[in-house]
């Protein structure tokens, strides 16, 4: 059985889809998935053993020059890739008009998605042959697991979902002389940031544990912040620029992770690493960390400035 998944973004949403693949793999031996996903997240599906082919899409980049010759050529190549197979099922787990019109519509096979009342954008459901009612008041992982179960005809397991990608990185782990923690300090929204003074206080508290601390970054301003956080602490390493897979290897080897609400926090959960995620304005209930050893640390009045380092350090122990 061959199935096309349409789940293009964001990092957290792509990761939240993985447990559904594990369910399907256990229910339908030999099932294989192709996956249409934004080029920036194309490494993620390849980590799961049920994925045969990753089809990168670049909607975010293409729309900046939609009718230019190079972009037209890329769109044509993408269309050919999506149309290359007759699928037993096409599952649109994105639920957006954009992805339904530009990806799902093109694919050959019976198209499944959420119905008018439960899709993220109701109009997207018009592109589906089979529309499934998936209750909204449940975690995003569970919604996607239910969608796959209904689309492929098996009962959704009652057990916690399994991302099943941690083993991909086990063979990559090398002996590390110094145990370490990872602090994920970078996120896209200003109100999701934890003040630098709080991070530095937490770094100071961790100093007595004998652990090193690693600080990844993805953009120049994040690198500058990491250097400010590390200043004066000889047990803190500002990492070089890394690919997503390289960051995943670092996370997979960590004793624990402390993170703000960011895509890499969801990657930590997918790798089954202990993780304390700091939440301010966002509610972790429906879209927070999902998996083993995931702890939400919510700030008073939904303001991360009110979350003190001592409280966070207490949760480490």
From Swiss-Prot:
Asked if Cell division is a keyword of the record, the answer is no
Q: Name one GO cellular component term.
A: plasma membrane
Protein name, UniProt field: Lipopolysaccharide heptosyltransferase 1
Enzyme class at the top of the EC tree: transferase
UniProt keywords (A-Z) are: Cell inner membrane, Cell membrane, Glycosyltransferase, Lipopolysaccharide biosynthesis, Membrane, Transferase
Task: Classify the protein's membrane topology as the record does.
Answer: Peripheral membrane protein
- Record Pfam families: Glyco_transf_9
Region forming the signal peptide: none
- Give the function comment from the record: Glycosyltransferase involved in the biosynthesis of the core oligosaccharide region of lipopolysaccharide (LPS). Catalyzes the addition of the first heptose unit to one 3-deoxy-D-manno-octulosonic acid (Kdo) residue of the Kdo2-lipid A module.
A single Gene Ontology biological process assigned to it is: lipopolysaccharide core region biosynthetic process
| InterPro entries, alphabetized | Glyco_trans_9, LipoPS_heptosylTferase-I, LPS_LOS_Heptosyltrfase
Q: Which residues bind ADP-L-glycero-beta-D-manno-heptose?
A: 187-188, 192, 222, 242, 261-263, 266
Q: Which CDD domains match?
A: GT9_LPS_heptosyltransferase (cd03789)
Q: Does the keyword Zinc-finger apply?
A: no
């Amino acid at each position: 059985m061959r199935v096309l998944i349409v789940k293009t973004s964001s990092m957290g949403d792509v990761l939240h889809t993985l447990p559904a693949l594990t369910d399907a793999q256990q229910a339908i031996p030999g099932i294989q998935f192709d996956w249409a996903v934004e080029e920036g997240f194309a490494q993620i599906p390849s980590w799961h053993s049920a994925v045969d082919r990753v089809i990168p899409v670049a909607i975010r980049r293409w729309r900046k020059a939609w009718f230019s010759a190079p972009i037209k050529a890329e769109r044509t190549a993408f269309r050919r890739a999506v149309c290359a197979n007759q699928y037993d099922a096409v599952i649109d787990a994105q639920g957006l008009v954009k992805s339904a019109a530009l990806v799902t519509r093109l694919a050959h096979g019976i198209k499944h998605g959420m119905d008018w009342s439960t899709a993220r954008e109701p109009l997207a459901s018009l592109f589906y042959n089979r529309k499934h009612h998936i209750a909204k008041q449940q975690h995003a992982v569970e919604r996607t697991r239910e969608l796959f179960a209904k689309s492929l005809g098996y009962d959704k397991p009652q057990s916690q979902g399994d991302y099943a990608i941690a083993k991909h990185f086990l063979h990559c782990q090398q002996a590390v002389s110094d145990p370490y923690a990872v602090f994920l300090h970078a996120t896209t929204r200003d109100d999701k940031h934890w003040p630098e003074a709080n991070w530095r206080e937490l770094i100071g508290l961790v100093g007595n544990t004998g652990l090193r601390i690693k600080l990844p970054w993805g953009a120049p301003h994040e690198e500058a912040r990491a250097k400010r956080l590390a200043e004066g602490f000889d047990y803190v390493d500002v990492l070089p620029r890394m690919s997503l897979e390289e960051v995943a290897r670092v996370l997979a080897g960590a004793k624990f992770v402390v993170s703000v609400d960011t895509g890499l926090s969801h990657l930590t959960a997918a790798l089954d690493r202990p993780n304390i995620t700091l939440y301010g304005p966002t509610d972790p209930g429906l879209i927070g960390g999902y998996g083993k050893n995931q702890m939400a640390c919510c700030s008073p009045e939904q303001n991360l400035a009110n979350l003190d380092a001592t409280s966070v350090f207490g949760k480490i122990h």
